[in-house]
């Protein structure tokens, strides 16, 4: 075997062994799903790790819309959007999103990851400055690091730190308009970005604001319009993803006309990717309608969150949030896995989230509630958490 092959094999083996020793080794679980439960190796477990916040992933109206879309448009789009992959269902969804969220345009992508990276790889150049919250999603951080622009980071939700960076950028690069990037809801902590204050700072320092609202759109704001609506601000660029509250997959970049056209001309993630199936876009249109009409889903999420905190013992360090994401910080990765497995043994699926997804020594259980859960489900979760945590 050539030396280069042995070197790669050694590197891979060493990295895997190190990750396992650190309690950070990740494995996929092959699951099937029905309602709010998952089935693993023949066992039914109540699922508290899904991002299907509004319970739309298995809603009959969404399933019917996708089946209708298959009949109308076939299985796949057949090409990238600039060839023959842009269909009437895609156009209808883009127009619907733009009207609902108050933007000139919506541009569809296959994932939130690709939408974020398309924006940050395409719009900034080497003369620009990106300013990001330190807890932003990996897709944003990776794109910032690989972007030709200069990237600066500020401590999580720290307005003073953001203001200092904006002042420094304005002083050092007076002709540059910085791009400030944050999430609306932070996926691992469930907390909200102080968008009203951030937007004010952006206005004062002539900066653009980009908000990734993957976990806020559909859940927060009037008719589910998201974190920006809740805060009363309009981001220059808004990222909406469809793998959470929409119950499907994909994403859209919300922006003005010129920005949309710029991305169409220059964003490689857009130009060189096959479009999402038009049947999927048809189903997403149905999801968008339900999100706007079904206020009861958001009201139920609020009530279930309150019920959980009513029933969990005060000694348990469950973080109260205004979102369906309820983190329980454990700290040690091995212990987080142990607690997760103990819950699994009692019929609850609650995933342990460990570094590098979260900072070192902040491993946690990421508990998520959905509108598909019942009050009985929440009481069972609380009772089991009380038992398991007290036993640890």
From Swiss-Prot:
Q: Does the keyword DNA damage apply?
A: no
> What is the annotated quaternary arrangement, including any partners?
Homodimer.
Q: What does this protein do?
A: Catalyzes the decarboxylative condensation of pimeloyl-[acyl-carrier protein] and L-alanine to produce 8-amino-7-oxononanoate (AON), [acyl-carrier protein], and carbon dioxide.
Enzyme Commission code: 2.3.1.47
Checking Gene3D superfamilies in the record gives: Aspartate Aminotransferase, domain 1 (3.90.1150.10), Type I PLP-dependent aspartate aminotransferase-like (Major domain) (3.40.640.10)
Pathway(s) per entry: Cofactor biosynthesis; biotin biosynthesis
Q: Name one GO molecular function term.
A: pyridoxal phosphate binding
Which GO terms of type biological process are on file? biotin biosynthetic process
Please identify the protein, giving its name as recorded.
Answer: 8-amino-7-oxononanoate synthase
In this UniProt entry, the residues modified to N6-(pyridoxal phosphate)lysine are: 244
Highest taxon, organism lineage: Bacteria
What keywords sit in the KW lines? Answer: Biotin biosynthesis, Pyridoxal phosphate, Transferase
Residue numbers binding pyridoxal 5'-phosphate:
112-113, 187, 215, 241
Requisite cofactors: pyridoxal 5'-phosphate
Q: Name one Pfam family in it.
A: Aminotran_1_2
Please state what class of enzyme this protein is.
transferase
Q: Does the keyword Oxidoreductase apply?
A: no
So what does this thing catalyse? 6-carboxyhexanoyl-[ACP] + L-alanine + H(+) = (8S)-8-amino-7-oxononanoate + holo-[ACP] + CO2
Q: Which gene encodes it?
A: bioF
């Amino acid at each position: 075997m050539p030396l280069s092959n042995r070197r790669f094999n050694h590197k891979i083996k060493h990295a895997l062994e190190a990750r396992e020793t650190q309690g950070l080794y990740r494995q996929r679980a092959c699951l099937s799903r029905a309602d709010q439960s998952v089935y693993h190796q023949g066992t039914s477990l109540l699922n508290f790790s899904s991002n299907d916040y509004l319970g739309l992933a298995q809603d009959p109206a969404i399933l019917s819309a996708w089946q209708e879309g298959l009949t109308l448009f076939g299985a796949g789009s057949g090409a990238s959007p600039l060839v023959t992959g842009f269909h009437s269902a895609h156009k209808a969804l883009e127009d619907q999103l733009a009207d609902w969220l108050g933007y000139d345009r919506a541009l569809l992508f296959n994932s939130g990851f690709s939408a974020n990276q398309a924006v940050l790889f395409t719009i900034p150049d080497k003369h620009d400055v990106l300013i990001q919250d330190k807890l932003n999603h990996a897709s944003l951080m990776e794109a910032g690091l690989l972007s030709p622009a200069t990237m600066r980071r500020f401590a999580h939700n720290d307005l003073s730190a953001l203001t200092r960076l904006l002042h420094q950028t304005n002083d050092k690069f007076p002709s540059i308009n910085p791009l400030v990037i944050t999430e609306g809801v932070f996926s691992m902590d469930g907390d909200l970005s102080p968008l009203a204050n951030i937007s004010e700072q952006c206005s004062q320092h002539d900066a653009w604001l980009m908000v990734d609202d993957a976990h806020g759109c559909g859940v927060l704001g009037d008719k589910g319009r998201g974190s920006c609506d809740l805060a009363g601000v309009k981001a220059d660029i808004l990222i909406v993803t469809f793998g959470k509250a929409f119950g499907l997959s994909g994403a859209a970049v919300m922006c003005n006309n010129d920005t949309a056209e710029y991305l169409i001309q220059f964003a490689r993630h857009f130009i060189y990717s096959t479009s999402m199936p038009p049947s999927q876009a048809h189903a997403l249109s149905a999801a968008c309608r339900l999100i706007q009409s079904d206020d009861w889903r958001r009201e139920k999420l609020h009530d279930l969150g309150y019920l959980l905190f009513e029933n969990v013992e005060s000694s348990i360090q469950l973080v109260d949030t205004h979102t369906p994401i309820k983190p329980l910080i454990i700290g040690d990765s091995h212990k987080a896995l142990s607690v997760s497995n103990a819950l699994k043994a009692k019929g609850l699926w609650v995933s342990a989230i460990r570094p590098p997804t979260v900072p070192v020594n902040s491993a946690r259980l990421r508990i998520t509630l959905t509108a598909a859960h019942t009050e009985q489900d929440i009481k069972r979760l609380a009772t089991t958490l009380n038992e398991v945590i007290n036993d640890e």
